[in-house]
Amino acid sequence: MSSRRIASLAGLAIGMLGNTGFAEDQPHTLELESVNVTSDYQFETATSPVQGYRATRSATATKTDTAIKDIAQSISVVPASVLKDLGSNSVDRALDFAGGVSKQNNFGGLTLYEYSIRGFTTSEFYKDGFSANRGYPATPDAANIERIEVLKGPAASLYGRGDPGGTVNIVTKKPQREAFTTLQTSAGSWDRYRTALDVNTPLDEDGNLLSRVNLAVEDNNSFRDHVESKRVFVAPSFSWQLNPDTHLLVETEFVRHTSTFDRGVVAPNNKWSGVSRSTFLGEPDDDIDNDNNMVQFALDHQLNDIWSLRLASHYKQGEMSGYASESRPLSADGRTVNRRYRERDNNWHDSITQLELRGRFEGMGLEHEVLIGTEYENYRKNERVTNIAPVAGTTYAIDLYHPVYGQPKPNGARSGTDFFEHVESRALNLQDQIVFTDRLRGMVGARFEHFDQQIDDYTTNRTSGQRQDAFTQRAGLLYQLTPQVSLFTNVSTSFKPNNGLDASGNTFDPEEGIGYEAGIKGELFDDRLSTTLSAFHIEKENVLALDPSTDTNRAVGKARSQGFDLQFTGQVTEAVRVIGAFAYIDAEVTKGDRTIPTGSRILGVAKHSGSLLGVYEFQEGVLRGSDVGAAYTYVGDRSGESGTRFELPAYQTVDLLAHYKASDNVTVGLNLNNIFDEKYYERSFSNYWVAPGEPRNFTVSLTLNL
C-alpha cells in the first residue's frame, strides 16, 4: 500500500479525533449497548434472534453492540428466519439476499471454500468473530445459525488479514432464559431427509446457568447421478452469569460429514447443448470424509462503569480424507472426458485467543466508545494430495454423454503435494467510535499485525517461509440528515498473506487493498423498512487466480472493482415482511499477463444481480400465523474461467413457499423451488468444472414445539 494512501487515512483519523468544532450545545449520545447473550426476543441485541427480517443491531462492524443505522459502513444481516422461510439449510442461499455476494469454488461440494463480495474472492469467513475457515472445514450447518452478517468493504483493521470486498460473520444461537424444545423434520426431492432438534434449558431457577443443544442429522441424495451426502451435527452451548459483572459463554461444535466429491459437468467448446445437468463424471464411490471439532469460550467482565474486559479463545481441529475422480480437459473427439484420480489426506489445528478492553467515556467534549484488542493465532495444517496415474497403456476417461462407471482405479505413478504449513500471527488493534454532535458520528480504527508462515514441502525436502508486518486502517463518518435518513462515507485498507505455493514452489507476496465507500441509509414506513444504498471503489494488488496451464494459483498483479449496491429489509406491515438486494459490480484485472490479460473479468462475478423475498403472514381467522411467499433471484452472466472467453449465462429463479400453522405447536411447510425449471449453472472454476443449479424441486417440513 502506498505511503500516500496511508498518510491520507492517518490524516483523516487525526482530523476526526481532534476537531471539536462540530460540537453543539444540545446533548448527544452514542447508541451502544453491552452484549446480552441471554436476551429475550423483544429486546434485540447484536446476538439475539431477529423479529421478522429487519435486524437493528450488529457487532460484526465494530465488535460492539451498535445500532446498524449508526454504523458508517454497509452491513447486511440475513436472519435465520430467512432460511427457515425458504426451507433451506445453505449459507450460500442466505448470501443471495445480502447483495453483491457471488458463488465461487465450493471444493467439490464439500465446503464453503470461496465466495466473492463486491467482486473480490475470499476464503475467509467468521463465526462469532473468530476465523472459521482455516483448513477445509465442512459447510456451516444452519441448525445453530442465528444470523449471517456481511460487512461490505475492507475490515482488516478489526479482523486482521482478509480481503477488501467484505467479511462474512456467522452469529450462532445462544442459550436463552426461557425453556423450549423445537423439532423440525423435512423431506424433499431426490430422497433428501433432515431432522433438526433445538433444546434450550435453564439449569437453575434464577436463569444464571443456561444450556442449549442444537442437533441435525441429514441423509441426502441429489439430482446429480450417484451424488449423496450424510451429516451429523451437534452443537452444545452453555451460558453462566457468575455474578452481576461477569459472564461466561462456552460453545462447541462436532461435525461428521461424508459426501461424494463432485466437480460438476463439462462444457464442450464452451457450450451446453446435449450435456445433462444430472451427469456425474466421477465414480459412485468417490467419497470424502470431513470431521470437525470446535470449542470456544468468551469471558466478559465489567470492571467499572466505564471499562469492561473480554477474554475469548477458540480451538478448531479437522480431518479430511478420501478419494475423487476429477474431470480434466475434454479430448479432441468432443465427448471423452479425461480424468485424474486423487487421494486426499489433510488435517489441521487452529487456535485463536483474543483479549479486548472496551470503554465508554467523554473526552475533549465528545463521547467515545473505545476498543483496544489483541489477538494471537497458531494455525497448523498437514496437506497431502496424491495424483495416481493409470498404468502404461491404459486411460481413466469417461464418456460425457453415456458415462460407464466402475473402471479399475489407476495404480500407476504417484505425484502431487505433501507439505506442512505453520502460521503464527500476533495483532494489536484500536478503534474509537465517536459522537461529535447529535447528528454527526465517526469511527476510526487501526491494526498492527505480525505474520509468520513456514511451509515444509516433503516432496522437494525444501522449506520456505515469509514474515510480514502490516498496518491497516479504517475511518468513517455518518451524518444524520433527519431521524430517518443518514449519509455515510468510509475508507479502509486490507492485507492478506497469500497462503500456499506457486508452480515453482515459492510463497506469494501478500495481497494489499484499499476501499472507498459512500452511501445513504434510510428507515422508512415508521422505521419498519431499513435500506442502504452505497457506491464503492476497491483496488487490490497481488490477486491470486487459477492458472489453467499449471492448475495452480498465481499472483496476476492488480484488480479493481467498482459499482453500487442496494439492500433492504423490513416488516412493511404487520403481515408483510421483505428482504432484498441489488448489485452492480464492474470487476476486472487492471494489470495482468499473457495468461490472464489486463481487462479480464474477475472469475464468477456478475455485473448485475438481485434478489427479493416477500412473505405474507395471515393475522386473523383460522389461518392466523400461517404464511405464503415467493422468492426471486437473478444473476447475470459471469466469467467461467480466469483469462478466457468462457462465460456462464445469466439465470433467474422463482421459489414459492407456504406454512400452515395447525396449532401453536404444529406447523407444516411446503417449499417449491425453481418452479419454472430454469436450467442454469451457479459456479465454475473452468469449462471442465461447472456446477449446475438444482432443477425444479420441493421440500415438505413439519415443525413441532414440544
Question: What are the residue ranges of the model-derived segments?
Answer:
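Structural signature of Gram-negative outer-membrane beta-barrels, strongest in the C-terminal barrel
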Residues: S239-N243, E253, W348, E367-Y379, ...
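Face-selective signature of the C-terminal outer-membrane beta-barrel domain
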Residues: A298-G318, R340-D456
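Acidic, small-polar-rich N-terminal luminal/periplasmic segments of exported/outer-membrane proteins
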Residues: E33-A179, L183, A518
